[in-house]
Regions:
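Residue-level detector of conserved catalytic or cofactor/ligand-binding positions
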Residues: 432-444
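Polar, glycine-rich mid-to-C-terminal structural blocks
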Residues: 45, 49-98
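Segments forming glycine/polar-rich beta-alpha architectures that bind adenosine-containing cofactors
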Residues: 93, 101-159, 195-198, 214-245
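Extended, charge-enriched "interface" segments that sit outside catalytic cores
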Residues: 143-204
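Long, C-terminal catalytic modules of enzymes
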Residues: 370-431, 435
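Long, K/E/R/D-enriched contiguous segments that form extended
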Residues: 23, 30-31, 191-301
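A donor-sugar binding/catalytic signature common to diverse glycosyltransferases
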Residues: 309-354
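Extended, well-ordered alpha-helical scaffold/bundle regions in very large, multi-domain proteins
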Residues: 3-59, 141, 149-168, 249-255
Length: 445
């Protein structure tokens, strides 16, 4: 608007018409703290002309809203771009865009039902869905040469230009020779990743065990803490049952936390400490290991994705906009275990119950539990495994205590880890015991 008004000399109406026919708004989060707002005084001081234009946009927008809502001042206040001495950037985006979309079917419904419900009721035709996607050539052809070669051998190279051709691989789902080659590709990728980890960290990985992967930004809603709770539960079980028949498993984490996000950094520290304590018990560590990789980036991801066997997509239902790691990992043959959230919903529709393992509450069930009054303390007092896990956090892991993580779960549990714990742990156990041929048939879909 500033360029069109000040540099090009357009009048307001012509400039605004160009703006609203040029811009579309893609929302990427339902987290209130991630919907950016700016302090009015700061903006006025640093960007006085921009702020003056925003004020005029808001005045005209609110006047228009008063007309179309029949004078509903409460709704207009909620939709206002400037409110409580803050400039609400998401509201500005909605006002200035010809269309608004989420990045998965579920997310797009959520923004219509809650995040931008007022805007949707005023202009429903502007809202649509555009599900996220990935550059599959990077995450398959460039990252997983062994699988690419096997696919080319089996179905030709048409899939390199047309991803839908990958469906032709289904016909080999019961072909033992192809499944054997698929298993060999996966093992080679695991060995390559293990070599990278050893060269960079000095940690040796057991390639005969399962590689269970959760790689994404560290945030409580993504529930790395739920994953950690399950690992601690396994650790306690193995301490009490050292000779138990336990399928070896390595849990691999890689993520970064926002600089000022204290709780996320505590969770990172806790995961790292779990891995370090496990190393001190070599016999147990052969069965259960944890690796937290620093400086997560695309080049590391290109080595990790092909080596992964279980993909953890475990956000609380209704909190993940889409996710793309779920797509990258599944493309490379990892079995997905996840909640009915984000793009998991559409993946489930595409591949069916046998090829993605859904656990936990649905979004309506989450909302219902919140409305009824969620009480994590009650679950803590009645659930022996959860209680033992938190007691371990209180007592210490590798010499460090994690009272703040434990208390946050016990007294608030904003993202309902306790409520989904049994379902999550049960799915973990069932997934581990899926036979190798079945796992390979699944990933050929």
């Amino acid at each position: 608007m500033r360029i069109l008004l000040d540099d090009c000399g357009y009048d307001w109406d012509k400039a605004w018409n160009i703006i609203t026919n040029t811009f579309d708004y893609t929302n990427h989060t339902v987290m209130a703290e991630a919907l950016e707002t700016w302090d009015v005084d700061l903006m006025q001081r640093i960007l006085p002309r921009i702020y003056a234009i925003i004020v005029e946009i808001n005045n005209r927008y609110c006047a228009h809203l008063m007309e179309v809502t029949g004078g509903d001042s409460e709704k207009v206040t909620r939709m206002s771009i400037i409110l409580d001495n803050r400039v609400k950037m998401a509201n500005l985006c909605c006002a200035a865009s010809s269309s608004v979309n989420g990045v998965s079917k579920l997310h797009s419904e959520i923004i219509k039902d809650s995040v931008f419900h007022d805007q949707y009721t005023v202009n429903p035709d502007a809202f649509k869905n555009v599900t996220n996607g990935i550059a599959y050539r990077r995450w398959l052809l460039a990252s997983n040469q062994g699988l690419t070669n096997l696919l080319t051998e089996c179905i030709g190279d048409g899939f390199k230009k047309d991803a839908s051709k990958l469906a032709d691989f289904k016909k080999f789902a019961t072909d033992k020779s192809v499944l054997d080659k698929l298993a060999a590709v996966k093992l080679a990728n695991k060995q390559a990743f293990a070599k990278y980890v050893y060269n960079t960290t000095g940690t040796k990985l057991n390639c005969n065990g399962i590689f269970d992967v959760q790689v994404k930004r560290l945030h409580e809603y993504k529930r790395q803490q739920l994953n950690a709770m399950n690992i601690i539960a396994d650790y306690i079980y193995l301490l009490n049952n050292p000779d138990a028949d336990f399928v070896p498993k390595t849990y691999i984490f890689a993520s970064k936390a926002a600089p000022g996000y204290y709780m996320a950094k505590q969770i990172i520290k806790m995961i790292w400490c779990i891995g370090e304590e496990l190393k001190k018990n070599p016999k147990l560590n052969e069965k259960l290991a944890v690796v937290f990789l620093e400086d997560y980036k695309v080049t590391l991801s290109e080595i990790l994705m092909p080596a992964s066997e279980i993909s953890e997509q475990i956000s609380l239902a209704g909190t993940e906009a889409s996710g793309t790691g779920n797509m990258k990992l599944m493309l490379n043959g990892a079995l997905t275990m996840g909640t009915y959230d984000g793009a998991n919903v559409e993946i489930h529709e595409a591949v069916g119950d046998d090829n993605i393992f859904i656990f936990g509450m649905s979004t309506p069930e989450v909302n219902q539990l919140k409305a009824e009054g969620y009480n994590p303390e009650k679950i803590y007092n009645s659930h022996a495994v959860i209680k033992s896990v938190l007691e371990k956090m209180y007592k210490g892991i590798n010499g460090a205590t994690f009272e703040e993580v434990a208390n946050s779960l016990r007294h608030a549990d904003r993202y309902m880890c306790f409520a989904d714990f049994d379902s999550y742990r049960g799915t973990q156990l069932s997934l581990i015991h899926i036979s190798e041929p079945t796992r390979l048939r699944c990933i050929s879909y």
